[in-house]
Amino acid sequence: MSSAVLLLLVCGCALAVLSPVAYGAPMDTDDRPVWDSIRLCDIPNEPNPGQCMLPAECVAYGKINDVSSLSSIERFSFIKQIQCNGSDTVPYVCCPRDSDAYREPYVNETMVPKNRVASRIAFDADSCGIQSYVAKIRGGQLAEIDEFPWMAMLLYERDNNALTQGCGGALISRTYVITAAHCVTGKNFQQTKGRLKFVRLREYNIHTNPDCVYENDLKDCSDDMIDLVPQAVIPHPEYDSESSNQQHDIALIRIEQTPPFTDFLRSICLPEQNFESSATPGKKLSVSGWGRTDIFKDNLGPDVLSPIKLKLSLPYVEREKCSKTFRPWSFALGPGQMCAGGERAKDTCAGDSGSPLMSYDMKRAIWYITGIVSLGVRGCGVEGLPGVYTNVHHYLPWIKMYTGA
């Protein structure tokens, strides 16, 4: 493998640059599990089961996967419901076995609004790390409409042009968002990314506002998205944008106080202990954001960020193994960095730079921010090459100096 493929990057818009081998190309048939060819699944409005397969191999899916579909509640809800658990490493969709087209590619529900009052009063008004989302059997990389309500999208403006999404972040209090330092500062930063204009909260689908989905005979709509003006941008004082290892890649953005928390807006908890001190190799972590995915690749292209909030599960990689992996390229893992990923076609292309790496405490039913998407390799999901994240626990004293939390 050439050194160019393995070159560590600091990505301004998303974690890594896709390569066909790593993320875009279908798996060779010989690499697939035997059950993959007979995995059956349900398709809305069709009496016969479909087959779980790669989006690029489903002719019917190619006919409905376009930008206009993402603006239609009925069509987008259909696309969400045909996600399936064909593989743990790449997105799959349920494809008709006896036709090259879906019979009725939309979900026409009764449009009765979902009542969310009960879930809103079940939690303390300011509690962190809690979400109303309940895991469903259906798989896929598209997040649910109320999943990870602390996610933030950073919007940039250059030369008075339209706003562009560039990085992610996470709400950690009513007035602070945490992100990567390289998302807010650095050499020639404004020339390459533009000026940080807004922090967007309560976003799910950038093509609609408010965002709605049909599920279980109900129409579920989020609160309107909100764009908040940054009051102060605080990169870590030791961050050096020209450093090859990008240590201290962490920043805080102070915003005006958010509206009251709801199912669609809540902060994530800061870690109470160092995740690495008790984690076992392979322990699952989660990442979310508006990164890259094969779900919309054929229509939007491989290098376009997703308009829909994504999610992905990643394995923790122990420090010694990660350091050994990058040693040939003279990359030294700093005390404030950690690693995750490194499985084939499974890395944080789904999450923008600055997005949170999250851990879930099952006993307390609380989400914690463990890391921040920082460094990646050329090609998301290159087997054996994990992504590098800023370890949030290492910077707690610095964070609390500003937030007071």
UniProtKB/Swiss-Prot annotation:
Signal sequence, renumbered to the chain: 1-24
Keywords attached to this entry: Disulfide bond, Glycoprotein, Hydrolase, Immunity, Innate immunity, Protease, Secreted, Serine protease, Signal, Zymogen
GO molecular function: serine-type endopeptidase activity
Pfam families to which the protein is assigned, alphabetical: CLIP (PF12032), Trypsin (PF00089)
Single GO biological process annotation from the record: positive regulation of melanization defense response
A Gene Ontology term for the protein's cellular component: extracellular space
Domain of life of the native organism: Eukaryota
Record-listed E.C. numbers: 3.4.21.-
TM ranges: none
Keyword Glycoprotein: yes
Annotated Clip domain residues: 41-95
Disruption phenotype: RNAi-mediated knockdown in female does not affect lifespan and basal melanization. Simultaneous RNAi-mediated knockdown of SRPN2 and CLIPB8 in female, reduces the spontaneous melanization and the lifespan shortening occurring in SRPN2 RNAi-mediated knockdown. RNAi-mediated knockdown severely reduces the melanization of injected Sephadex beads.
Active site: H182, D249, S353
Subcellular location field: Secreted
Post-translational modification as stated in the protein's UniProt record: Proteolytic cleavage is necessary for activation. Cleaved and activated by CLIPB4.
Function: Serine protease that functions in the melanization-mediated immune response. Preferentially, cleaves substrates with an arginine at the P1 site. May be involved in the activation of the prophenoloxidase cascade upstream of CLIPB9; does not cleave prophenoloxidase.
Protein name per its UniProtKB record: CLIP domain-containing serine protease B8
Organism: Anopheles gambiae (African malaria mosquito)
UniProt lineage: Eukaryota, Metazoa, Ecdysozoa, Arthropoda, Hexapoda
Underlying gene: CLIPB8
